[in-house]
């Protein structure tokens, strides 16, 4: 089965892949992965000490909205709505629990469902927000305000015009099954009665299979399973928006140059970074600018691994001053961005 799905793309904090591949092919560097903490897009104010989760989406089987009630009977809408909302919040909780900011134990979603037909309502009034936060004994709420989700199946006839054998005609169909929807989330500050964040997004997940009409269509997911996967990923994506997360990024260090650079490379490969750094520091003052530049570059990585970003920038800049390589300039830019991100992280979570 061939699945073509929407893929969430996160900007990589890594060295340009083409440059890295070129260096690796020459066996002059060794690639490693390090884990970095990426700040959330949304900063929860530090006066917020507790958060509750609220579902304010309208109930589609009660809303009398033709776009909902035309396609499926109320009992089917009830089942799908239950699945979708459960998975929205399960994805959200899993994302938040994967971060260092939240520690949710048996989180509860409080239901404040609406019976109107407004998919995406106006923000809560100060009075209504105060009522909810007081009722839940919380400083803030993360609320699913509304959603619209639909699915569709398209069949494409891709039959082969060639007779493969006498009396045999090859038939092939392409089946595109799509779940598409729009979700609206808001984060409310119950202490000051204001909005912290408002986020509305439209996303699509697609499954594609090929084959004869009966065989291929059975390879597509069941409707409820497709909705489960779609809703879970959308909730997870929103959770990643509001909480810092760990990310694996690619880095490299030089392993060729002179005896000390090679020996330090072996130390680093075996996890003896302190010993490697000692040799690199010796070579950072080498009269050979190429050796000194490599040693300084490696010391920049050593410093970054220890989360010492200012020394890392200093070492990378020193390397670039010696030899103006494009990859070094790129690395300096990455480190500068990480330095700014660290300042943002200090406003989001306590860092030691």
Residue ranges with predicted function:
Residues 69-75, 81, 150-178, 206-209:
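Mixed-charge, low-complexity intrinsically disordered segments
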Residues 33-35, 121-126, 163-167:
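Short linear interaction motifs
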Residues 139, 151, 271-274:
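Short, compositionally biased leader-like segments
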Residues 54-147, 327-330, 339-349:
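N-terminal segment of the mature soluble domain
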Residues 26-48, 175-182, 186-295, 299-352:
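C-terminal/domain-edge helix-coil "capping" segments
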């Amino acid at each position: 089965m061939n699945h073509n799905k929407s893929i969430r793309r996160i900007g990589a904090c890594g060295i340009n892949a083409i440059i890295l591949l070129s260096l690796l092919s020459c066996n002059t560097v060794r690639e490693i992965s390090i884990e970095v903490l990426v700040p959330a897009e949304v900063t929860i104010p530090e006066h917020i000490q507790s958060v509750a989760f609220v579902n304010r989406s309208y109930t589609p089987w009660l809303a009398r909205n033709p776009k909902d009630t035309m396609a499926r009977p109320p009992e089917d809408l009830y089942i799908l709505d239950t699945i979708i909302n459960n998975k929205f919040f399960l994805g959200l909780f899993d994302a938040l629990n994967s971060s260092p900011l939240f520690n949710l134990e048996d989180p509860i979603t409080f239901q404040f469902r609406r019976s109107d037909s407004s998919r995406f309502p106006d923000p809560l009034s100060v009075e209504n927000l105060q009522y909810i936060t007081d009722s839940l004994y919380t400083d803030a709420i993360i609320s699913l305000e509304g959603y619209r989700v639909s699915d569709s199946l398209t069949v494409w006839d891709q039959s082969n015009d060639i007779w493969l054998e006498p009396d045999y005609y090859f038939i092939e169909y392409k089946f595109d099954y799509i779940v598409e929807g729009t979700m609206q989330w808001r984060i409310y500050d119950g202490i000051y009665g204001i909005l912290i964040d408002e986020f509305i997004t439209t996303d699509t997940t697609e499954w594609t299979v090929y084959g004869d009409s009966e065989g291929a269509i059975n390879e597509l997911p069941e409707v409820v399973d497709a909705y489960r996967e779609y809703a879970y990923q959308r909730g997870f994506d929103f959770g990643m928006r509001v909480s810092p997360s760990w990310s694996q990024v690619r880095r490299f260090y030089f392993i060729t140059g002179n005896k000390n650079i090679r020996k330090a490379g072996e130390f680093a490969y075996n996890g003896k970074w302190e010993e490697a750094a000692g040799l690199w520091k010796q070579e950072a003052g080498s009269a050979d600018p190429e050796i000194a530049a490599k040693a300084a570059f490696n010391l920049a990585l050593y410093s970054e691994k220890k989360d010492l970003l200012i020394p890392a920038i200093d070492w990378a800049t020193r390397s670039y001053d010696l030899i103006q390589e494009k990859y070094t300039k790129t690395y300096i830019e990455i480190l500068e961005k990480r330095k700014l991100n660290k300042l943002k992280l200090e406003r989001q979570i306590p860092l030691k």
